[in-house]
């Protein structure tokens, strides 16, 4: 992850039926969705000179895993089930996950370079 200037936000995405316990201590923004629903995770940035944005996910007990990236000269980039949208005017990007599955339960990070 060399060259990453800032880590903007992280979000715990969980399927409603997956988590039955209570979390103690760290309170992360949480998005709970039903299996099969679409999810949207938003991220804001402040450095208008940023030209490269990356989304990672980190499953419990594992290291961060690259999901998708986008360059500042693009508005949209699509993967297999994920799409990233970049709005440079308002310095905002979003990660859309189609047909959410149990394997999507993770902490999500957005970063700039």
Swiss-Prot record:
GO terms for biological process: adaptive immune response; response to bacterium. Gene3D superfamilies: Immunoglobulins. SMART domains: IGv (SM00406). InterPro entries: Ig-like_dom (IPR007110), Ig-like_dom_sf (IPR036179), Ig-like_fold (IPR013783), Ig_V-set (IPR013106), TCR_variable_domain (IPR051006). Pfam families: V-set (PF07686). It is found in: Cell membrane. GO terms for cellular component: T cell receptor complex. Its main location: membrane. Residues 22-113 form the Ig-like domain. Disulfide bonds join 43-110. The keyword Acetylation does not apply. Residues 1-21 form the signal peptide. Keywords: Adaptive immunity, Cell membrane, Disulfide bond, Glycoprotein, Immunity, Immunoglobulin domain, Membrane, Receptor, Signal, T cell receptor. Glycans are attached at residue 87. The keyword Methyltransferase does not apply. Alpha-beta TR is a heterodimer composed of an alpha and beta chain; disulfide-linked. The alpha-beta TR is associated with the transmembrane signaling CD3 coreceptor proteins to form the TR-CD3 (TcR or TCR). The assembly of alpha-beta TR heterodimers with CD3 occurs in the endoplasmic reticulum where a single alpha-beta TR heterodimer associates with one CD3D-CD3E heterodimer, one CD3G-CD3E heterodimer and one CD247 homodimer forming a stable octameric structure. CD3D-CD3E and CD3G-CD3E heterodimers preferentially associate with TR alpha and TR beta chains, respectively. V region of the variable domain of T cell receptor (TR) alpha chain that participates in the antigen recognition. Alpha-beta T cell receptors are antigen specific receptors which are essential to the immune response and are present on the cell surface of T lymphocytes. Recognize peptide-major histocompatibility (MH) (pMH) complexes that are displayed by antigen presenting cells (APC), a prerequisite for efficient T cell adaptive immunity against pathogens. This is T cell receptor alpha variable 13-2.
């Amino acid at each position: 992850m060399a060259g990453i200037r800032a880590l903007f936000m992280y979000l715990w995405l969980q399927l409603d039926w997956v988590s039955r316990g209570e979390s103690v201590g760290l309170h992360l923004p949480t998005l709970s969705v039903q299996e099969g629903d679409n999810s949207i995770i938003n991220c804001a940035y402040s450095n208008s000179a940023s030209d490269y944005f990356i989304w990672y996910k980190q499953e419990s007990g594992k290291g961060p895993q690259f999901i998708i990236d986008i360059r500042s000269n693009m508005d949209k980039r699509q993967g297999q089930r994920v799409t990233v949208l970049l709005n440079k005017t308002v310095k905002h990007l979003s990660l859309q996950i189609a047909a959410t599955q149990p394997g999507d339960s993770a902490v999500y990070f957005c970063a700039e370079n």
